[in-house]
Amino acid sequence: DGVCSNRRQCNKEVCGSSYDVAIVGA
């Protein structure tokens, strides 16, 4: 998948190859 269910969780944990910042930007 590469996308975290929760943005906060992605903040500390890496989602695939992108971070929460990448998801927010996208």
Swiss-Prot record:
Reaction equation(s) it catalyzes: an L-alpha-amino acid + O2 + H2O = a 2-oxocarboxylate + H2O2 + NH4(+)
Main location: secreted
Keyword Flavoprotein tagged: yes
Protein name stated in the entry: L-amino-acid oxidase
Superkingdom, natural source: Eukaryota
Species annotation: Aplysia dactylomela
pH curve summary: Optimum pH is 8. More than 50% activity is retained between pH 3 and 12. Inactive at pH 2.
Tissue: Expressed by the ink gland.
Any one GO biological process: defense response to bacterium
Subunit structure: Monomer.
